[in-house]
Amino acid sequence: MMEERAAAAVAAAASSCRPLGSGAGPGPTGAAPVSAPAPGPGPAGKGGGGGGSPGPTAGPEPLSLPGILHFIQHEWARFEAEKARWEAERAELQAQVAFLQGERKGQENLKTDLVRRIKMLEYALKQERAKYHKLKFGTDLNQGEKKADVSEQVSNGPVESVTLENSPLVWKEGRQLLRQYLEEVGYTDTILDMRSKRVRSLLGRSLELNGAVEPSEGAPRAPPGPAGLSGGESLLVKQIEEQIKRNAAGKDGKERLGGSVLGQIPFLQNCEDEDSDEDDELDSVQHKKQRVKLPSKALVPEMEDEDEEDDSEDAINEFDFLGSGEDGEGAPDPRRCTVDGSPHELESRRVKLQGILADLRDVDGLPPKVTGPPPGTPQPRPHEDVFIMDTIGGGEVSLGDLADLTVTNDNDLSCDLSDSKDAFKKTWNPKFTLRSHYDGIRSLAFHHSQSALLTASEDGTLKLWNLQKAVTAKKNAALDVEPIHAFRAHRGPVLAVAMGSNSEYCYSGGADACIHSWKIPDLSMDPYDGYDPSVLSHVLEGHGDAVWGLAFSPTSQRLASCSADGTVRIWDPSSSSPACLCTFPTASEHGVPTSVAFTSTEPAHIVASFRSGDTVLYDMEVGSALLTLESRGSSGPTQINQVVSHPNQPLTITAHDDRGIRFLDNRTGKPVHSMVAHLDAVTCLAVDPNGAFLMSGSHDCSLRLWSLDNKTCVQEITAHRKKHEEAIHAVACHPSKALIASAGADALAKVFV
């Protein structure tokens, strides 16, 4: 009985825990379920463990806690899925927005860069136009003025010349440009008066000559025909004079149109302009014009007083500084080639006047007339070249001649250097670039008579260059030269080189403490010839450390060397042994020597510089120091990198680490001059054989040429690049040719002409 009640309770509990719509009948565990009434109306559910489905007429099931929980879980899962899809779409849209923003920013940067490039090109174009304008006309172009460029106008049909001809803006700009030219060349009122008198003399004064009465401004003007030519020409003279004065003085009347003036000049109807040759910017502008003869009776000039003519010529000749050089002292005066009053002179004056007026028209910016000549005019004269202001002083002075002015061209590699004393006044340009070394070049030496150079490098080699065997790499580029011989014997960097007597031998010193004597091979040798062991003559041994400086005296046939071991030695290079003649121990008193040189005025004296800033003069015959030069500056001792001697004077020049160059008197030891020469340490010096100029090199990558007369810099050349905070190591001047050379830490040597 108890078991049946427990089974019924379990069945009731199980039925209450089923979800909505399940109508299975409970039964004992392990037994077949018995039929139970369905929760809702309708037929009873069938047994077998499965609940019977409600019938077609079943109504809504009542809510239960499990059903509510199931619904909430289902809705929560659907919400999470939609949220995940929304997050994915949001991330995708954000990525797309970021991509579009990046594209927009990139386009803005590109636009900014293009605008910057356009402005840069516009600026470069303005600079080129100003340069071309200055070369062509000799005056600086005013960037504020806008010039009408007809050639740049693109149109599908023919350009109407009437539009530009009647434009007041073109007239105004042309007058302003002419006024600027006249003011810049000193074309004052006095010169204008002289020019007015000359125009009168060329045209003829109609009032006095022809006896005609000049019409007033209100009276109608006579046409430029045979009947009314006298009055018209006198009025033309007056209008031309007023126009010239207005252009120069800058009055308010300069803005008026001058069409009425040019309309009465019949010989301007057939002017034809030809463009100048664009291939040569320095050619003067040539205008070929066809002239039309005027009746000679209206152009008979009045015979002016000779004194007035001379005064005019003297006044105008004061401004004869624009000549191209063709009208020298021996050039004939075209105004005095014929007898006064002859038909040839009248014709020449008439042609000059026509050229003046035609060129005034060209400067004003007017296009040439395209209409034919008026009926009844004679045949035009053959064209001839006439420039503006042709009649100033009767010479060939013109704005076109300003184009003949020359400027220094950096790409022009040729320079007339026949006079070595005046060579420093010229511009030195790079011509040869020597590129065969693999490390910095420490020293240079020129051949005494040939165009050959010897270089010593830290790569352990010396190389001989024949500068006459140059190969052009490209147009307007420095010439490349290949070495004809490489000297190899040093065990380490080669630090110094010196050329022997007559350039038969050369000497090199290196970090291996050895001095090698070399025989110079034939300069015409083939670089690919076999090795000649006789090139190495012998070795001078005696130093205990690196040899930093060498100097050879052709007078005494002695070789001087300075070493890091603290000694200065004098050698007889022609002797096999013992080659060392004397030794000057300097380490205890002055320190380590850095450079040595022979004095030109006293062949038995040498001068040595030291790291301590001292400069000592030695006597080879006595074997002792003569004088210690006062080479230390006021700021304290600084290392001296090189010492050289003036070729004609008892003067020693030193290059210091404190950017200075000092000039010392060998007789007194006092400093003669001191100057700050570079922006960095001065490393090397060279004096030309005539003593006219000094060349200095520095770690600021610049070469500077100094006039020894006034100690001023006449030229600066940037030739080398820095490497390990070092730039230029050595400079040299050719003893007999107009050549200079420099060597640097960039493993390049450059030759200048």
UniProtKB/Swiss-Prot annotation:
Does the keyword section mention Cytoplasm?
A: yes
Instruction: Pinpoint the residue ranges of every WD repeat in the record.
Output: 436-475, 489-528, 542-581, 587-628, 635-674, 677-716, 723-753
- Predominant location category: cytoplasm
What keyword terms does UniProt attach to this protein? Calmodulin-binding, Coiled coil, Cytoplasm, Phosphoprotein, Repeat, WD repeat
Report a single Gene Ontology molecular function: protein-containing complex binding
Chain positions covered by the region annotation Calmodulin-binding: 165-182
Pfam families associated with the record: Striatin (PF08232), WD40 (PF00400)
Q: Where is this region: Disordered?
A: 10-65, 213-232, 271-345, 363-382
Q: Where is the composition biased (Pro residues)?
A: 370-380
Q: Give start-end positions of Basic and acidic residues composition bias.
A: 332-345
Compartment annotation: Cytoplasm
* Biased composition, class Acidic residues, residue ranges: 271-283, 302-317
Alphabetized SMART domains for the sequence: WD40
Q: Which GO terms describe its cellular component?
A: cytoplasm; dendrite; dendritic spine; FAR/SIN/STRIPAK complex; GABA-ergic synapse; glutamatergic synapse
Q: Which residues form a coiled coil?
A: 69-136
The biological processes this protein is annotated with in GO are:
negative regulation of hippo signaling; regulation of modification of postsynaptic structure; regulation of signal transduction
Q: Which InterPro entries match?
A: G-protein_beta_WD-40_rep, Striatin_N, WD40/YVTN_repeat-like_dom_sf, WD40_repeat_CS, WD40_repeat_dom_sf, WD40_rpt, WD_repeat_striatin
Q: Which SUPFAM superfamilies match?
A: WD40 repeat-like
Function in brief: Calmodulin-binding scaffolding protein which is the center of the striatin-interacting phosphatase and kinase (STRIPAK) complexes. STRIPAK complexes have critical roles in protein (de)phosphorylation and are regulators of multiple signaling pathways including Hippo, MAPK, nuclear receptor and cytoskeleton remodeling. Different types of STRIPAK complexes are involved in a variety of biological processes such as cell growth, differentiation, apoptosis, metabolism and immune regulation.
Which proteins does it associate with, and in what oligomeric form? Part of the core of STRIPAK complexes composed of PP2A catalytic and scaffolding subunits, the striatins (PP2A regulatory subunits), the striatin-associated proteins MOB4, STRIP1 and STRIP2, PDCD10 and members of the STE20 kinases, such as STK24 and STK26. Interacts with CTTNBP2NL.
The miscellaneous annotation reads:
The name 'Zinedin' probably originates from the name of the famous soccer player from Marseille (Zinedine Zidane).
Into which family does the record put it? Belongs to the WD repeat striatin family.
The protein's name is Striatin-4
This protein's species is Homo sapiens (Human)
Its encoding gene is what?
STRN4
